[in-house]
Swiss-Prot record:
This is Tyrosinase. There is a cross-link at residues 90-92 (2'-(S-cysteinyl)-histidine (Cys-His)). The gene is tyr1. Cu cation B binds at residues 317, 321, 360. Its cofactor is Cu(2+). Belongs to the tyrosinase family. Keywords: Copper, Melanin biosynthesis, Metal-binding, Monooxygenase, Oxidoreductase, Thioether bond. The keyword Oxidoreductase applies. It comes from Aspergillus fumigatus (strain ATCC MYA-4609 / CBS 101355 / FGSC A1100 / Af293) (Neosartorya fumigata). One of its GO terms (molecular function) is metal ion binding. Cu cation A binds at residues 69, 92, 101. It comes from the Eukaryota. The keyword Oxidoreductase applies.
Amino acid sequence: MSSNKPYVIKGIPVDAGQIIPVRRDIDEWYEDTSRQSRIQLSIFIWALREFQSIDYKDRLSYFQIAGIHHFPLITWDEEEPPVPNKPGYCVHNNVTFPTWHRPYMLLFEQRLFEIMETTIKETVPESHKQEWRDAARQWRLPYWDFAKTSGPHATGPLSLPVLCGLANVVILNPANPETPIELPNPVYKYRAPDLMGNLDKPFHIPPERIDPDKDDYYPWDKCQATTKYGLLKNNPHIQDAGQDVTKSNLALNEHPWYRPNKAGFPPLQTLTYEVHRLLSFKFSSWGAFASTKWCNEENKPPASQQTRDILSLEYIHNNVHNWVGGTDYLGDPSKPDLQGAGHMSSVPVAAFDPIFWLYHNNVDRLTAIWQVLNQDHWFDEPHPSDAKPDDPLKPFHVSKDKYFTSDDARFWRKYGYDYDIVKKPGTNEDRAPEEVKMKINQLYGEPISRLHEGQPVEYDYVINVIYDRYALDGIPYTIVFYLHLKDGSYKCLGGVYTFSTKLSDAQDTERGGCDNCREQKKAGVLASAQIPLTYTLYERQEWHNLGKLLPVKETADIIRQHLCWKVVGVNNSILFDSEQPMRGDPATWRSLDVTAAYSEIHYPVDRNYKYIDRGLPAYHNYLPIHLSPT
């Protein structure tokens, strides 16, 4: 059992004057056959298995550290032993979204390193200890670059890490380092000692309500193991429902939004394009980049010039959670290939799935990239309700008597890790911005290179949406956008997943959302997201017959006349339809505001208008597209 003293998060130590090791791309690391990487993989797998086997009542167990994210809503690393913690620690829809998760990743990384050190001390033979110790000190928790395509010229599909799809994995045996051993893979899933709803109070995991009107719940309490797309209402195999990696990969590439008819079209993956835009935009402030939180005077809809502040890191993050885990517990007949629900799609239990840690490491990496390119933005232009940079990031301790703050978390290198994309080779300093931009283009620039037609000025089209993530009292839902064409078909443009959970009430305190969510609902705080249309319209020219250049008047007319949207519940019901605005309960959706806009794109080009890969596009002066009344 761990000590009751505060657990101080310092990161993996680095000797003075030494180069700080980098967190590596997990697929590149897994495929690296060098001796050091093979040892690192082996000690990582061994340590993660040990971590997951620690008694769930131990503060430093995998179970309790994963539970910080939400369920089981107990205190962690506070003065008293774990007790029910109705306030929770949630920071979603909040400007501290990236900074709160930074020490969270550090905590996980540090715990694994501590277990590695113990394993080397107690298990590895003396003749191999130094080699394994050196490899462990160079190890850092890898990241999953969810927007990096595979194949030549980055044109292949997106996919989960290879390691996440292996039920078993072969490593070097720490007790006999020259001998391979095959073990159940702890990155594949987490398995609790019993059904999570049967664990002793206050550690038990409850079900999660997914329907505001009916008693439909995600049965997390009946799960012993995490799953991806494994839970279906009429499927009795809940305890260990499996990892349908094929569905996760399909969702990452097809983006399985609700489709009101089955007139399909080839999958169009837009995640890579959105990440490139995120890192290209000149946001007005840190908060605009960091969070979906939408606060302005009286929550008015965004003016066109604010369009560049609607896209955010958190919006992209929310959708990927949905695609990796799956939300279709009831089974939507319009998408049979993507039925099923899993832990990653749910705020309360996402962190129990081991892929969560690889995934959020990449969210931290994207934050670091943006920080290097935007060093003049840090909690600037705050709204009065925004968290301050010196507010505590509970429950993480930076010292025995002080919680982390965002200011503490701002500079990542002092915690013993770095990322290659932002690190000047051979130093502990930033790369030059031009070199970072070149790497962004190499990793995520393929869609934008297809869009650039060698013209001095081209155009960008977007949908901006302001929504209330608590409209269903926190129960998650999706807003899906379409072009409803003259032939009656609906062409899907994209969507927004709220990644939220039901707020608690007096009768249901153990299952509900946190204080942050309740306070935001009470204050009327909204959320925002942006659906980029340019790449979709370019790749789907057969929808509009306008050609590749997407002339402004004609393109705006199509958006104005044919854009529509539906709000879809996790139970697959249509909760709001812009073409039938009186359907359902209009009052619930009165704050939902959809606007469209266009702007010029100025590409970084030479005198022959050839794209310069050391620059990023500039998006200028958005103007409104006035939508036709429904």
